[in-house]
Amino acid sequence: MLTFMEHILYSFYDASGWHRDNLYALLTHSSQNLIDFRVPEGVAMNVSALSTPNSASSYTLTNLGHIQGSVAYLSTSLSLPRPHSGTLDLHTVVPGYHKLDPINSQDRIYDTIWQGGKPIHRQDSLLFGRLALPTNTLEAMYVRRFNPTTQLLVTCVSGAHLKSGGALTLYWQKDCRQYAHELLYSTNEALLGARGLYNFGVDMSKPHIASRLSVGGEFYYGVLNKSPGMSTALRYVTQSAYTGSPLTMTLTCNPIMGEFSSTYSLRTGPSSSFSTRYDFNMYSYLSNLSMGAEVWKSRDSVFKLSSSLQDKTARVLWGGRYKDILVNTGVAFDYGGRVPDVTAIGVEFQYAC
């Protein structure tokens, strides 16, 4: 389940017209949501509020054998709708199968303001900060839109227990809908990187066409440790010829590590989705088959289940709403031994107004 601040961030992206479907890092978004979903640990309570249309605050208290907490603030130049945990659509905070938005050349008109017959691009921004206690770890994020296709994202973390005291990462992102690319730099090992994605079979004048083939890749290099890395991937999105249900297939490859991963995700019905993933290493010949599914019992209740056969791990999660409070509870365990070993168990409560 997304946190309140994550929901506000995605609302900012939607309001500013930024589409995340073309980000290479989110190419396997659907399978990750259905297989690698996060299970809460301990007991956590989060209280958040959008005090004004342009600012929000959030307070979290967690018990993991010892008390931890965090205080977060967010400010944006855009006026955002006020979410209330009692009326919020649960589908927006519980990620599952993600159906890609159609590519339309006219979907960025509202990003431009016309003055004197000349276009003036809106340069909206978002600033976020969070302080974790008692570790005194500070996290910050800055998002700045320069024009309808370009965005700067800056993230940083600072703490005495971190290597070099923290790290700063910059992402220069450009999304032209037909293709997208981003450049990144991180002070951690002086990392330099580039990512790109191109969509084939796209007709801007016919956004209703469901099929789409996306091909992308990334390359990065750590200057200090002289360590390169790269990966390539493709994603095919279409609809089932028999049921009309949307489905997504992906194939990713890391040639340096010899790792291949293929996924197949399908929305099996109005309230259910299913995903499988097969991982294979060409050097060690090790493989793993993972499966995950979600079922919505109602608009206010969802069950998730995933398992990996080689790792012999399983996860069970329930997300729902009790009155005006969002509840997220689950358990993860390892069934490889004679007695199943619980690796994570917890419950989260969220209230937002």
Swiss-Prot record:
Q: Name one GO biological process term.
A: mitochondrial outer membrane translocase complex assembly
The record's annotation in Pfam families points to:
MDM10 (PF12519)
Q: Which UniProt keywords apply?
A: Membrane, Mitochondrion, Mitochondrion outer membrane, Transmembrane, Transmembrane beta strand
Membrane topology type: Multi-pass membrane protein
Q: Does the keyword Membrane apply?
A: yes
Q: Which cellular component terms (GO) are annotated to the entry? A: ERMES complex; SAM complex
Q: Does the keyword Iron-sulfur apply?
A: no
Which InterPro entries does the record cross-reference, listed alphabetically? Answer: Mdm10
Please state where this protein is localized: Mitochondrion outer membrane
Would you identify the family this protein belongs to, as annotated? Belongs to the MDM10 family.
Assembly and binders: Component of the ER-mitochondria encounter structure (ERMES) or MDM complex, composed of MMM1, MDM10, MDM12 and MDM34. Associates with the mitochondrial outer membrane sorting assembly machinery SAM(core) complex.
Record remark: domains = Lacks alpha-helical transmembrane segments, suggesting that it resides in the membrane via beta-sheet conformations similar to those predicted for other outer membrane proteins and porin.
Q: What does this protein do?
A: Component of the ERMES/MDM complex, which serves as a molecular tether to connect the endoplasmic reticulum and mitochondria. Components of this complex are involved in the control of mitochondrial shape and protein biogenesis and may function in phospholipid exchange. MDM10 is involved in the late assembly steps of the general translocase of the mitochondrial outer membrane (TOM complex). Functions in the TOM40-specific route of the assembly of outer membrane beta-barrel proteins, including the association of TOM40 with the receptor TOM22 and small TOM proteins.
State the name under which the record lists this protein. Answer: Mitochondrial distribution and morphology protein 10
- What species does this protein belong to? Yarrowia lipolytica (strain CLIB 122 / E 150)
What gene is it encoded by?
MDM10
